Amino acid sequence: MKRIFSAVRIEPGELFLKSFRDLRSGLCSEPIKWVEEHNIHITLKFFGETDERQIPGISSSLAEIAQNSGDLNFRLSGIGIFGSRYQPKVVWAGIEPPEPLALLMKTVQQEMLKHGFESDRQNIVPHLTLGRIKFLNDRVLFQKLIDANKAISSPQLIIKECILYESILQREGPRYIALRKFPFGK
């Protein structure tokens, strides 16, 4: 069994990373599990623990989807939260425009139904997860820093491939290994 997911790798640029570091630094006393900079990606589909015999079929489907897809052009724009203002669960950066990435995510999820994987969610909201929140000690400070970083953005990004990753959970954080890359064909 391998814990796997498909994703697009993101290199958001130094200005975005500086804002991200400032946000993390300002919230360093909060129990937020931040994404490591070298692990920044946008998940297309999380498969979880998967029988290794399924990986060739998954790879074949991802290769076909990628071959029929064009490069993705978008920028990271704004910071938001999933959950409520009182119980935030995830800190994320938005995608602008979201439609091409949403279409790719929907296509991947629909194709993976054929391999026995359920859809992850009803409403697909393309986003870059920055951190996961267990609880907050200081909600006022948290909201102040989120509001102060609402304008965070990246330059235009051009994504030319999707990747099937293995996720190995370790005490110091997950380690991602690219199992296969699928270049976009259009």
Language-model features, listed with the residues they occupy:
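Basic, often amphipathic N-terminal segments
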Residues: M1-R75, P100-S153, Q170-K186
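Active-site loops and adjacent core secondary-structure elements that bind or stabilize anionic groups
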Residues: C162
